[in-house]
Amino acid sequence: MKIRVALLQLNPRIGKINENISNVYKLLSSSTQQQPTPPPSQTTITTTTTNQQLNSKFDLIVLPELAITGYNFPNSTAIKPYLESIDKFGPSLNLGRELSIKYQFILVIGYPEFSHDDNKIYNSCAVFNRFGQLIYNYRKSFLYETDEVWGCNENPIKGFPSIELDFSPTSNKIREDINVNETSETTTQLIITNIGICMDLNPYKFEAPFNKFEFSMSSYSQRAKLLICPMAWLNPSSPSILDNEEFDKSDKLELAQELESELKENLDSAEASWSTINYWILRFFPYLSHKYSIMPKWFNNKTSTEANNDEKVTVLCCNRVGVEEDVVYAGSSCILQFNNHGKYNDATDLTNESVELIGNLDQINESILIKEIDL
């Protein structure tokens, strides 16, 4: 099955909701041509497409973690004006609903949630079907330190349960909405899907064993073929991760400005953060063909009696760009596919032949990546 996917790589500024929403619409309505280069103080909006114009029909669009609010809030008071809930939509959820209706696609958008059920704050992402209906709400399970600063809570539902998205032309629902008495002649095109937000890819609290691979192992055991990962992933050189004993806040702010300037000097020739993409690949180790990846592969390998020859596993990493105080984000949004061609080697990065980079964006520009992919 082929679907058209779009990843929006955004630079949401805290306190500028309307401007952030406007940038989303600009990206979606832009042509395939790169926009004129703005002044150095601004971020270029670029597009990367394949085989279709931007106004062509999408099947799925993904926006980053906390897509239009920004992420690095200093406390719970600061984020409070931006909180919304599934029973009281705010700007993020309204945008998701409006876009999914306008373009008639499945949409995933990250937003800060306040739950009226337990009066807690969550870092969440909502899934809308092509009719603007909220069909699934996922809450981040593994929290980064910034989440805790602004009062976020862990997902009370453990284990990264999967859902089934229906990509058939007339129905975009999760499995719970589907009649169990449907006949074999049904046109549903269900894809087992897992959603993980940024830190969910890492070991729990950075304390769990590195090779536990909680998110990817859970996805693998549920035979998920589509993994959707909205992110606010840091640049490996982000000053925010430097030792506080060696660098004070003013030092980090200065270093962040220097890094931002350095990146912007190469706007037109900007590349992805390849170390970031390679790390993401490593975090999906169970899907790699590697001599130490001992999980029996259930997809694609023609020599396997277990495998379905038509299956690949697709990972959508939708990250953000920009700078928030001393935090510099990595961008580099990408589409990865694991193919299990049966060629095993020691590589855990892009040089491993069992993983394909279908497309990627750079680490500085607000951009859109559009690809047609086989699921």
What are these regions (language model features)?
Residues 88, 114-231, 235-244, 249-252, ...:
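Active-site catalytic loop in hydrolytic enzyme cores
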Residues 9-11, 64, 72, 139, ...:
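Residue-level recognition of beta-strand->loop/alpha-helix junctions
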Residues 31, 36, 40, 50-80, ...:
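Active-site beta-strand/loop signature of hydrolases that rely on acidic residues for catalysis
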Residues 4, 56-57, 104, 192, ...:
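Short loop/turn motifs at secondary-structure junctions
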Residues 4, 124, 332-334, 367:
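Conserved beta-strand and immediately adjacent loop positions that scaffold enzyme active sites
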Residues 11, 131, 339-341:
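Solvent-exposed strand-loop boundary residues in beta-sheet-rich modules
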Residues 1-44, 49-60:
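N-terminal glycine-/serine-/threonine-rich phosphate-binding loop
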Residues 91-108, 202-361:
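CN hydrolase (nitrilase-like) catalytic-core segments centered on the catalytic cysteine
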